[in-house]
A protein has these predicted regions:
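Juxtamembrane intracellular "pre-TM" segments in multi-pass secondary transporters
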Residues: 1-5, 178-204
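Conserved MFS/SLC helix-loop-helix module at the cytosolic interface between two early adjacent transmembrane helices
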Residues: 55-91
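Paired small-residue
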Residues: 83, 94-102
Length: 240
């Protein structure tokens, strides 16, 4: 059966999407201290991001099964873009919480969706390699974001640069085809409860839950800690 999409183009789009997630995960780190200097309560923003990432990660699966990958990738990227712009524009703490929630929610969807689509479009012989390359794109996005903030003092400029690049990629997503939706069988509540009888599954879930939480929040606070207690200059703390 002939595919209705280009595997290479879908893979490139997935890599771009996960790179955006890398930006989203580290977005607060370099700018949290400047925000706290002018806005009381900014240090609570990472908690809101964690809630957004959690919800996005949970909800993307049923939506993909029903509607497919393409427009969910577009919408999640647009939410991430709007979150970045909110951080660049707003000075009100409530609007910043809304922005960071959108950023986390969109990023959580991007993380799950991009891994899912790459796992679907490649067979067993290539899947592992392609997923490894995809994971490296997360690091690329995070590294580029860190370097931009290291060399540019005004944090709004990297936010705007990332937004422009993301807008161009969203246009690219709209122009290519993705694998169609594959509605799955109905999953009953008893099926879900039945998973609780596997202790190893629960253990791995708990480990990943706390690991992801620490990963998401530690990057936001590390720069502030190194600057305030480690004696590092702000630029050096950002690069760390």
């Amino acid at each position: 059966m002939q595919k209705s999409y280009s595997t290479n183009l879908v893979f490139i789009a997935s890599c771009a999407g996960l790179a955006f997630f890398g930006v989203a995960m580290l977005s607060l780190g370099p700018i949290l201290t400047p925000l706290q200097a002018v806005i009381d309560g900014a240090y609570a923003l990472p908690s809101t991001m964690s809630i957004g990432i959690l919800l996005g990660t949970i909800l993307f699966g049923p939506v993909v099964d029903k509607f497919g990958y393409k427009w969910l990738l577009v919408v999640s990227s647009a939410l991430t873009l709007m979150g970045l712009q909110g951080l660049a524009i707003f000075k009100d703490i409530n609007l910043l919480h809304l922005s960071i929630f959108m950023l986390g929610f969109g990023g959580g969807i991007l993380n799950g969706e991009t891994n899912a689509v790459v796992a679907e479009i490649y067979d067993d012989n290539k899947r592992g390699t392609k997923l490894a390359i995809l994971g490296a794109c997360y690091c690329v996005g995070a590294l580029i974001w860190t370097l931009l903030n290291y060399f540019i003092e005004d944090y709004t400029i990297p936010l705007n640069v990332a937004s422009v690049v993301m807008a161009g990629c969203i246009a690219f997503f709209c122009c290519i085809s993705f694998p169609p939706a594959k509605p799955s069988e109905n999953v009953t509540f008893s099926n879900v409860v039945g998973l609780l009888k596997y202790p190893s599954l629960i253990l791995f879930a708990l480990v990943l839950f706390f690991q992801s939480a620490f990963e998401g929040t530690s990057g936001s606070y590390t720069i502030s800690y190194l600057g305030n207690f480690g004696g590092l200059a702000e630029s050096d703390a950002k690069l760390s």
